[in-house]
Curated annotation (Swiss-Prot):
It is found in: Cytoplasm. Xanthine binds at residues 20, 27, 156. Pathway: Purine metabolism; XMP biosynthesis via salvage pathway; XMP from xanthine: step 1/1. It catalyses: XMP + diphosphate = xanthine + 5-phospho-alpha-D-ribose 1-diphosphate. The keyword Cytoplasm applies. Gene3D superfamilies: 3.40.50.2020. It comes from Halalkalibacterium halodurans (strain ATCC BAA-125 / DSM 18197 / FERM 7344 / JCM 9153 / C-125) (Bacillus halodurans). It is an enzyme of class 2 (transferase). This is Xanthine phosphoribosyltransferase. It holds the Pfam family Pribosyltran. One of its GO terms (molecular function) is xanthine phosphoribosyltransferase activity. GO terms for biological process: purine ribonucleoside salvage; xanthine metabolic process; XMP salvage.
Length: 198
């Protein structure tokens, strides 16, 4: 998605060989025009899949998930990292390691919200090693529901999250696939492939 790549180039900040900061437009401050385009792109890719719920983890996945769900006309659920007092123990739960925060969280979703007949689209801001993705898959499986696919805003293709998911048979749609953060700059997969073919 060209507008997303442009935002990454112009407003993203490479902090290391594995970390990209996008808090000026995606996961702290949100660019409403861009997030709407992101939502439209995922909705278009998954429009014929009979999606009944969109699922993400709080908090960075909330903005894109809400917009995707709006375009698909279905509810969205965010797995909570901290169980509020208002949530009973009637929950699905999974352990998820955060690459960025270097910590493990127990994520929960109320059993009242996810059911065996649901067809679930999982949305997240980043895909690196697939920890969050598999944690959300586990919750969907506990409900007896079906994961239809993954919508990833930014994929770090140099890490193995995509391979792990596709090896398990999951569909993965990423709007920006990053090959590397070499020398503090972002190189996208399609640009890398173009360079190799020259």
């Amino acid at each position: 998605m060209e507008s997303l790549k442009q935002a990454i180039r112009e407003r993203g900040n490479v902090l290391s060989d594995t970390v990209l900061k996008v808090d000026s437009f995606l996961n702290h401050q949100v660019d409403p025009k861009l997030i709407n385009e992101i939502g439209q792109a995922f909705a278009e890719r998954f429009k014929n899949e009979g999606i009944t719920k969109v699922l993400t983890i709080e908090s960075s996945g909330i903005a894109p998930s809400l917009v995707v769900a709006t375009h698909l006309g279905v509810p969205f659920i965010f797995a909570r990292k901290k169980k509020p007092l208002t949530m009973t123990d009637n929950v699905y739960r999974s352990q998820v390691y955060s690459f960025t925060k270097q910590e493990t969280n127990e994520i929960t979703v109320s059993k009242d919200l996810l059911h065996a007949d649901d067809r679930v689209l999982i949305i997240d801001d980043f895909l690196a090693n697939g920890q969050a993705a598999f944690g959300l898959c586990e919750i969907v499986e506990q409900a007896g529901a079906q994961v239809v696919g993954f919508g990833i805003v930014i994929e770090k293709s140099f890490q193995d999250g995509r391979k792990k998911l596709t090896d398990k048979g999951y569909r993965v749609e990423s709007l920006a696939r990053i090959q590397s953060f070499k020398n503090g700059t972002v190189q996208f997969v399609d640009e890398f492939v173009t360079q190799l073919s020259k």
